[in-house]
């Protein structure tokens, strides 16, 4: 919203604006003439497909419900939201195709905008964590909260911020990994911290 006045002024002056990456949700109509970005919803779907391949057997073997954490740094950025929703909707689609019930809980934006109808006693719970402020500390705490839930089998991070927070949140708990009794960690983007975490097995990918 802070940019909207400037965008309107640029439009009125005939200055074309091209956005990159996240886009500008709520921008004055016609002020942003194009946006160069990943199809973030499709990217989230692809992440879900690859993740579900790894989780499928664990879900089948679980006697009770299983929880898949979804970490987003915010509920306002177009790229973050769509990567999260793409992941949520595709996991739900795949799980439902295998005969499981699915629900979404946590952040209201994701619960309301996902294609999943909330239901009680679901086999697969998609638990969305978004911090009140975008800080590494709060996101690491979100990760720890998810890791400390007994039914969590996976956590997905929708960008580098969330991925690095997963690594930090795991430091004392040491629950992330690819073993049957560990929590699978998958994330978007890369950087030194995430690359090293994939290399040493903390993150699956």
Identify what each model region corresponds to.
Residues 1-205:
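A residue-level marker of the well-folded mature domains of exported/periplasmic proteins
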């Amino acid at each position: 919203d802070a940019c909207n006045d400037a965008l309107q002024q640029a439009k009125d002056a005939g200055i074309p604006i091209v956005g990159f990456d996240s886009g500008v949700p709520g921008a004055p109509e016609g002020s942003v003439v194009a946006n160069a970005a990943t199809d973030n919803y499709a990217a989230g779907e692809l992440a879900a497909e690859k993740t579900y391949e790894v989780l499928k057997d664990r879900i089948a073997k679980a006697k009770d419900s299983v929880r898949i954490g979804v970490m987003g740094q915010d509920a306002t950025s177009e790229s973050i939201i769509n990567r999260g929703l793409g992941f949520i909707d595709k996991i739900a689609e795949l799980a439902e195709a295998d005969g499981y019930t699915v629900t979404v809980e946590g952040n209201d934006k994701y619960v309301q905008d996902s294609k999943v109808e909330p239901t009680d006693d679901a086999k697969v719970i998609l638990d969305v964590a978004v911090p009140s402020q975008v800080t590494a500390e709060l996101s690491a705490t979100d990760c720890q909260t998810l890791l400390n839930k007994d039914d969590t089998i996976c956590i997905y991070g929708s960008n580098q911020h969330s991925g690095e927070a997963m690594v930090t949140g795991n430091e004392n708990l040491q629950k992330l990994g690819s073993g049957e009794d560990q929590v699978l960690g998958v994330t978007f983007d890369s950087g030194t911290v995430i690359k090293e975490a994939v290399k040493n097995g903390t993150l699956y990918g």
